[in-house]
Structure formats: C-alpha cells, structure tokens
Amino acid sequence: MPIIQVHLLEGRSGEQKKKLVSEMTGAVCSSLDVVPEQVRIILSEMSPEDYSVGGTLFSDKKK
C-alpha cells in the first residue's frame, strides 16, 4: 500500500487538489502495478508563514 505525503502552500482550490490526487494515483498505479484503492495520499497544507526558503520565510519573499 503506497502512502504519499505532499506538502504544499495553502491556497489551491478543491478542483486543483482533486486533479493532483487523481493524476498522482494514476502515476503510482502504472509505475507500481497497484490498484487505485491501495494508494493513499496525504495533502498537508501550510501557510507562507510556516515555510522557509534559504532562511527567509516564504511570506516575506512574496513582498
């Protein structure tokens, strides 16, 4: 049973997330030869204040 965890910044629409998990599930099924019911995907959203790139909060980089 593959389990995939995806970390992403908040703000994506429900439709974008549906498309992401659908396409990821398809890719996992074809590459690992499993059925969709075996694939688990965890989406973890975070705010720009909780993410850093190069020592700078992402929320500060957008300014």
What are these regions (language model features)?
Residues P2-K63:
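A domain-level signal for the structural core that forms small-molecule/cofactor-binding pockets
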